[in-house]
């Protein structure tokens, strides 16, 4: 346990943003932290560097904390770290531990909105009892598909139960991603990144069995958009899911790299990009049928088996 923490957000702190430019003298950096936060850093202090990708050489500095001052514990967080690790910064390989954070899963959403009993029920896979509460679970699943799992959005939904506020926050997040394209991506790739990003809902709404470059731009070829897709994957904004030739073990051995689909990182953001209205929550199973299953679970069965497997 820590007695206190010293928090630095490099996105809105111009003084600290350049603190690593001169050198990596840990004592000098600790003094700067004290001057900015008013916290005297000791071994019972957790140092938090937020949006570390905004600080030039910030990632490199972590190496020197680990090598020269391991008694101090540092947590570094940030968006687009996958992109930052491909920049000119020297990444401290072997000096840091990773923890990836994702949008809330359905079970985590249930726990967050006070439905822990249903989360436990699903974890136990008591299919008889699950069937008995089918209607309630479907309503909760609809909520999840609309709200999604972005922490700020879920927190607002818990506090206010306002679907209009949910959509407004989701749109704000989408707008911030769009700004990040211009800020962090190679200038030449920005237009293609935006085209790929904006095409995802339209791609998933079609009957296509794979991603079609012609939907992005008429006459487009794979090589024109490969870097844009990789940038979005590195940024953690989309998932690339390849087709498999058969459901064997290990699944990766049967991956068909020539055919894939792209999915957004969050179901709520997917709905916001698609313009899905709150009324969809009341319209039967529209949330499950629209977008060809892109925001719901999928089932697989082989011709030789009667079993259904979740995918």
Put a short name on every predicted segment.
Residues 305-306, 310-311:
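Positively charged, low-complexity/disordered segments
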Residues 13-39:
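Short glycine-rich substrate-engagement loop in P-loop NTPases that contacts/grips substrate
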Residues 73-79:
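Structural recognition of the conserved hydrophobic beta-strand(s) that form the central parallel beta-sheet
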């Amino acid at each position: 346990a820590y007695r206190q923490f010293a928090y630095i957000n490099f996105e809105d702190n111009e003084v600290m943003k350049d603190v690593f430019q001169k050198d990596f003298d840990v004592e000098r950096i600790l003094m700067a932290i004290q001057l900015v936060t008013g916290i005297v850093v000791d071994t019972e202090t957790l140092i938090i560097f937020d949006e570390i990708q905004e600080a030039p050489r910030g990632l490199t500095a972590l190496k020197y904390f680990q090598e020269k001052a391991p008694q101090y514990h540092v947590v570094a967080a940030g968006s687009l770290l996958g992109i930052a690790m491909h920049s000119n910064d020297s990444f401290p390989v072997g000096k840091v531990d990773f923890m990836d954070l994702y949008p809330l899963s359905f079970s985590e959403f249930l726990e967050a909105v006070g439905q822990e009993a249903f989360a436990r029920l699903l974890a136990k896979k008591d299919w008889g009892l699950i069937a008995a509460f089918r209607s309630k679970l479907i309503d909760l699943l609809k909520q999840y598909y609309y709200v999604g799992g972005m922490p700020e959005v879920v927190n607002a939904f818990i506090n206010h139960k306002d679907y209009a506020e949910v959509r407004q926050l989701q749109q704000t997040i989408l707008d911030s991603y769009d700004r990040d394209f211009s800020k962090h991506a190679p200038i030449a790739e920005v237009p293609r990144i935006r085209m790929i990003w904006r095409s995802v809902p339209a791609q998933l709404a079609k009957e296509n069995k794979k991603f079609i470059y012609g939907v992005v731009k008429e006459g487009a070829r794979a090589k024109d958009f490969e870097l844009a897709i990789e940038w979005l994957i590195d940024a953690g904004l989309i998932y690339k899911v390849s087709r498999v030739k058969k459901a064997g073990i290990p699944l990766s051995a049967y991956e068909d790299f020539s055919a894939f689909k792209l999915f957004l990182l969050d179901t709520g953001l997917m709905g916001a990009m698609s313009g899905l209205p709150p009324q969809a929550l009341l319209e039967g199973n529209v949330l499950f049928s629209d977008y060809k299953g892109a925001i719901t679970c999928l089932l697989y069965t082989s011709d030789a088996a009667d079993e259904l497997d979740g995918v």
